[in-house]
């Protein structure tokens, strides 16, 4: 297989990502490395939540849940016995009076699970059923009130388009829009961003990247500093203050479901990030009394060899690593399958991509 090309600056970032990866130690018990739930899965869309959950599992999550509509549960269960599937999402067909529902009451079975979860992925296969979306909105509000980090993709982003206040100012969530979703979000927030045609018209690649970065920064700022991964030929990652460009090469085949590898990977990385900040293991780093606020603060933490990182820095690293792993999965799968590549082929590449880009923390290597 053609070797992966990683720039020196990217290698530095991946080395920092390794700091938030929990080592494999005998003292850890089941679930201590994290529990992630994907909220999505409907009659027409059962593959997306499966691919997202499996990416999370293959990256190393201890426990993976799918919270879906009843019509999707048996199908998703049949895909893999490794996933815990909960048919708790109501839909128009499952309630007696869809026009008059108590969304908070319908959300309560899902809300009761939140105390056992470390991160959520909201949107894969969710669909646009009105009852379902109202219930998921209540779950998002409750997750935010408990500071549970979450990823929003696909129809989960539709909820933000309709009500940006759901995430505005929440620094523990990541949005992963594609080109069209990004444009809809920008329009909903009254932001004028350059069209893809305008960006493509730039003859200098650096000018194209600059315009994409500015657009991503603008959208993040309008949402109060929410982290955004703008998916494209290269991924643009921004929290409105600091922006990173993923320079890893991906595969040339585009197929539905590849973004689910991204969301699942992000779910695992968010759970690991929570464990890092909870000091679930001794990272060997020096305490850092200063919380990173500015771009200079974040860059200083990234350049530091042995200083604990702030949440703002680790959230950017989570987004960076999720993007990088997904692009490497795509590259590997495309090299192996070419035009026949399917979303499931990316799932098979998650572990090797992790080892190639990030690698096991030093404490794990002594036990492997």
UniProtKB/Swiss-Prot annotation:
Source domain of life is Eukaryota
Cellular localization per UniProt? Cytoplasm
Question: What is the catalytic activity of this protein?
Answer: (6S)-NADHX + ATP = ADP + phosphate + NADH + H(+); (6S)-NADPHX + ATP = ADP + phosphate + NADPH + H(+)
**Residues that hold (6S)-NADPHX according to the record:** 125, 178-184, 260
Q: What is its EC number?
A: 4.2.1.93
Which SUPFAM superfamilies does this chain map to?
Ribokinase-like
The terms under GO molecular function for this entry are: ATP binding; ATP-dependent NAD(P)H-hydrate dehydratase activity
One Pfam short name: Carb_kinase
* CDD domains, per database record: YXKO-related
Domain (YjeF C-terminal) spans 13-357
Against InterPro entries, the record matches this protein to: Carbohydrate_kinase_pred_CS, CARKD, Ribokinase-like
Which family is this sequence assigned to? Answer: Belongs to the NnrD/CARKD family.
Described by its record, this protein's role is as follows: Catalyzes the dehydration of the S-form of NAD(P)HX at the expense of ATP, which is converted to ADP. Together with NAD(P)HX epimerase, which catalyzes the epimerization of the S- and R-forms, the enzyme allows the repair of both epimers of NAD(P)HX, a damaged form of NAD(P)H that is a result of enzymatic or heat-dependent hydration.
Can you say what this protein is called? ATP-dependent (S)-NAD(P)H-hydrate dehydratase
